[in-house]
Structures are given as C-alpha cells and as structure tokens.
Amino acid sequence: MISPTSLAGPWRPPSSGGTVGDQYKGMIAGVKKQLENLKADFPDYDGRGYEIVGFGWHQGWNDGCSAKDVAEYETNMVNFIKDVRKDLGLPKLPFVIAGSGFGGWGQKIDRRLGVMKAQEA
C-alpha cells in the first residue's frame, strides 16, 4: 500500500489506543488472507510452507506535518512493531525502518527532525 497517510491516523496500531487505523486493519487482514490462500495466487505452491523473514517500513512524512503526531511517532512505531508481530504470530519478526530524508542532511525543521530521530530509535 502506498498512500499519504500517518502512523497516528490510518496506520494507527491497536496498542496506541484510540481508533485503530483502517490501513493497519486492512494490512493485517490482507496478509492473513494471502497466507491462507497461497495456492490461488501461486498455482505451483505445493504446501511446503513459507517463512516471513522481515518487514520493511518506509513512512513518516505526513506525521512530520503535525507537532502532535511527531510527539507520539516513536511510541506509535514501537506499538506498530509489537502489534504486527502479535497479530501475525511472529514474535521475533525483524523490522527495517527506512528513514525519511525530509530535505536531506541539512534538514532544520523541528517536526521533521523529530520523526527522523524517532525512526532511528
């Protein structure tokens, strides 16, 4: 899914409280559905099993538009990782967080720097 959304909104994980984001719910449901129906999309799949070896995340620009979203970004990211691992039954699933560049090395906007710092945590 590629869309201009925030971790504080449509991607909001259950452990962050409030309304769980529609994109979070859709992602979890979509992954589970795909795994239950591998043969439908991969006709040569012979049921030998599979392994999910990691999760890539590249997001954060829209959270950098709001001081409130920046303030909770790190907590939301920690909760997102914890909840994805729980919801997919993969307690040790590795995550790779791609940092948001936001204007390159010379970035000076506090909100953007806040998200970048949270992504490094």
Which role does the model predict for each range below?
Residues 1-121:
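Cell-envelope and extracellular/periplasmic
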